[in-house]
Amino acid sequence: MRVNVVGAGPAGLYLAILLKKSNRRHQVRVIERNAPDATFGFGVVFSEGSLDELQRADYESYVAITESFASWNPLDVRYRGTTTRIRGNVFSGIARKELLRLLQERADELGVELEFLREVASLEPYLESDLVVGADGANSLTRRTYAEQFRPKLGAHPAKYAWFGADLAFPVFTYIFKETEWGVFQAHCYPFEAHGSTMVVLISEETWRRSGLDEMSEQESLEFTQAVFQDELGAGHRMLGNRSLWMNFPWIACESWHTGNVVILGDAAHTAHFSIGSGTKLALEDAIALARACARWKENREAALTEFEIERQPVVERLQEASRVSADYFASLQRYFTFEPLQFAYQLMTRTPRITHNNLAARDAEFVRSCETWFWSQAGGAAPDGRLVAPPPAFAPLRLREVDLANRLALAPVEDWGAHLRAGAGLVITPLVAVSAEGRIDPTTALAAELPQAPSGGAEVMVSIGHAGRRGAMRPRRQGVDLPLAVPDRWPLISASPLPYAPWTPVPEAADPARLVEPFVEAARQVRELGYRLLELDFSRGYLLASFLSPLANRRTDEYGGSLENRLRGPLAVLAAVRAEWPAELPLGVAYSASDLAPGGLTAADSLEVARRFRAAGADVLRVLTGQTVWETRPEYGRTYGAAYSDRVRNECGVPTIAFGQITTVDEVNTLVAAGRADICILDR
């Protein structure tokens, strides 16, 4: 087989090695525009798990690479004048130039033809070979040439970052967070040789502009950034530059990775944010998978390339999603700068769903025990009864006004909620209880006056009252969601505007704002008379009050429509009136949709403003939901998918939150509450 590989980065060189190793008769050529010793950046990092694949794929290069590693186990977090160390994070670093040299030597040893200083302006001269491999990086000529076939999706993360070096070896992988007059500067630092480290510095675009970095030369930028981190570098040490330009991280994802005899891999096909340290790992694993597929299918090139895609794309997509979560986390890190150092380090380590409380405990049990003890002391106001070991965070108590919840677990909405009071959750939230007969979802929806007396013992019950609005007069949901009753069985519907919820549902009348408040106040009074101590107002999921909040459902031209201030007027009037009716010592919650998950819906900024206004009007806890404002919702699913919204609301608005969304284990609850992303979590059953 004749193979032309465009690009002599790690992916291209490693693929050439593996192809030539699998069959010495293969004619493998690597074409590179730069000199063999030219490289940008400083070091690359590998996790412990990624080395197993390299060992199996080519033991000779594995030995050469690992003998050049700088390895470490702990990880340091430097924040607010403290250093927190977390063990069990086994990583290794190597100079990028050294990695490329070792791969070049191995390729040359096997007989790979290496052509440096050759500019590839067109792929045309190389297409006569059996296989053309685009390993030409994020700015791939190969991908651009076949854009119609690869169908790339390109984007850029809003934060700015630059790669620097340092003339010292940090003892371990080190995160540094510095508050400056211009904003927060972050450095992700790792050693790659005896006297050298990589420092990736990350800042917001606002900080980049406020500091004047947007107008500085490369040398001026280097000197400025060194001054920011001089205390961490220490006297006599300095930062180093090598094309250390401020950039936005490029997002690259392609629907297809091959066409005909052309295939792309590594950064040419996909990128993953540097904060999860997987870019080089993904590139090398691409090479392993492609070489393996070619060896298995031999002359059947299409089968080999198809198998390569089928094997690698799901793996890459999962890591890309994790890297997006991680990138967004670092871009919004300032919201956590009120956290104590232990909790700050904990939430840093658990920033993606891949690392949970149990995972972290397996890495560093002592660190997790310290976090558990600290969390319990914060929740209970004192050490947990003098115990040597604190219970897990999910079982810490929570006080809302004068009501104490036994733990952070919730069940909701529970149709037969009375049967779940002793299931172990500290809180049980009822399904929507209608404030009037016209506010029911379906004929089986309970009215406040029909509730039983508040039970004694077991979990606390939060009664969720609301008005279904244009999602009312439906069949019971066991027959299907949002299916209208037969015409004779329907009751009149109201909404913020006369817009049907879905094309097949009835058109409601525009609600009279003057008649919004009293049904909620009366329902709250009835709930209290029955002895319940927790009440929630349901302003979510397209129900009546939610329709006032969302620009997708509210097209009014009076003082209750248009601006966010106007759209809030009705919900805030209800909240204020119910808060005045509900006893001052008892907590009042609000459920609201933090995102409509549909184009043109509530913006992220407006969503946070809504949460702040609810808090100011007397809401003690917010159940942060998403979607269902309109039937065209584009749902987001995945492990703990709703936690990010809860996190944002809790830590930017200063209000306790209830998180939802495929939270299925106590381990996940431990993780979310200990990290400060929620105060209570609804367990999916």
Annotate each language-model stretch with its function:
Residues 8-18, 134, 245-325:
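Conserved mid-domain beta->alpha element of the FAD-binding
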Residues 48-163, 368-378:
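Conserved N-terminal helical subregion
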Residues 11, 36, 139:
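Conserved Rossmann-like nucleotide-cofactor binding loop
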Residues 105, 126-249, 253:
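Conserved FAD-binding catalytic core of PHBH/FMO-like flavoproteins
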